């Protein structure tokens, strides 16, 4: 199964935290992993300078890029409402969009973000076993 790597997991890796999420990203660099444009945008926004931007682009290019389609926005809104209805409000709507793309792609998500923990509790999103909130 493809692993969709969220921005929070990339941050763990880039900071070399030594966490299980960090180590899993390192392991996935040579296997089947995916991102979407929203993850790419968030990671690239953190570039310190042009040189770092180039390094980040090279790193992200190792992942398959899954395009966001129009239906993903409706699905993201539905995921948000499902979580809210179950007593957990997702803090960042972009996480719902990323989750919608991962679900459509039949991929599990690797994350270090409480929003994805909530999404995986109340929707069909599957969290990678090494994920942490």
Sequence positions of predicted segments:
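Acidic, PIN/NYN-like endoribonuclease modules and their adjacent C-terminal/linker elements
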Residues: 1, 99, 103-133
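Short, well-structured N-terminal submotif of metal-dependent ribonuclease cores
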Residues: 1-35, 44-58
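A secondary-structure boundary/capping signal
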Residues: 6-7, 39, 112
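Phosphate- and divalent-cation-binding pockets in alpha/beta enzyme and binding domains
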Residues: 13, 42-43, 75, 118-119
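Structured helix-beta-strand junction loops
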Residues: 30-32, 62-63, 86, 105, ...
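General small-molecule cofactor/ligand-binding pocket signal
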Residues: 34, 66, 128
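Short, hinge-like loop/turn segments at secondary-structure boundaries
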Residues: 51-54, 83-84, 126-130
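Active-site neighborhoods of divalent-metal-dependent phosphate/nucleic-acid chemistry enzymes
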Residues: 65-112
């Amino acid at each position: 199964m493809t692993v969709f790597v969220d921005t929070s997991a990339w941050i763990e890796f880039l900071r070399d935290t030594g966490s299980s999420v960090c180590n899993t990203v390192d392991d996935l660099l040579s296997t089947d992993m995916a991102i979407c444009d929203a993850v790419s945008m968030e990671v690239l926004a953190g570039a310190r300078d042009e040189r770092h931007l180039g390094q980040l682009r090279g790193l992200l290019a190792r992942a398959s890029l899954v395009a966001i389609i129009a239906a993903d926005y409706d699905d993201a809104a539905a995921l948000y409402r499902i979580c809210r209805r179950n007593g957990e409000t997702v803090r960042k709507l972009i996480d719902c969009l990323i989750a919608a793309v991962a679900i459509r792609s039949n991929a599990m998500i690797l994350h270090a973000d409480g929003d994805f923990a909530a999404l995986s509790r109340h929707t069909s999103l599957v969290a990678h076993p090494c994920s942490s909130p």
